[in-house]
């Protein structure tokens, strides 16, 4: 009896409600999942296709749409379903395939036509060497042959190839000994590099024989730019010496780095030895430049910054009432700081007009109207405001 507990005990009013987890609504994920699209949609009977027994194997691609029959009843009770849609005609299917192939092809349909047009234009265009008909006369045959091998491998320029090949045969198999070549002039050639030792020998002795040799060699090797400009006259048959006599011979030659070196005073030309010392004016200018350079040199910074203590007034006053002062300076009364100072009048500092007034009066002239208005405005009289002009006038009279 003692173990038995009363089943119907009095409960508090809050105990009759549902627990907290029952009041919580279901999650939104479950509600959304109901309206979610299924992975496998329901079967559509309009796309059913009945096939033969031998055509249900798809190892070698899709079966042909022809000869589709219903399977035998003794073997299968239900039809076999394929999810293919209604098949189109073979002709329209070929057109669609051609369109897809054209889209995914690397070459556009207009590119082959453009390629053929470019090839035809290249065949119609002239050869690059056809613009120079006299190319064989101006170039040596060896260089011309190398150029033809690179630019004309198809042997379109038959005359040039025949000229080069015939020239090669004559060079390889000379029938008669060639006569000795005449001395060729060294015009329009690059100047040879003269070593420093050769120039040193030329500069040590300035004898007339050496100078003549040097001038002859330069005249023989180099020509002026004017001769190069009158090349057209030489082609017409004009004599070269007659053109040279009309103009002065001014050969141009630039020294190379090999010729530049440090030389002693003895090796200098006699004209340069007289200019070793400076003139009086040059010495004065050089001395002034040295003094000016010394002035420009900055003196060493001997200033050292020192720490200075600052204060802003008494601590029990407002910071606005204080003023920045050094620690050794006395404090300023805050009441004086609160009082606004009078705005300074510009005319108070005009000492010049007053002195001008005294000067005019001392000479016996009338006072200008501007100065009279100024004195009336400030309340000045001629005797109250005195300037040292009166005393100065007495001394100089």
Curated annotation (Swiss-Prot):
The organism's place on the tree of life at top rank: Eukaryota
Intrachain S-S bonds: none
Similarity annotation: Belongs to the FAM47 family.
Name the UniProt record assigns to this protein: Putative protein FAM47D
Record organism: Homo sapiens
Gene designation: FAM47DP
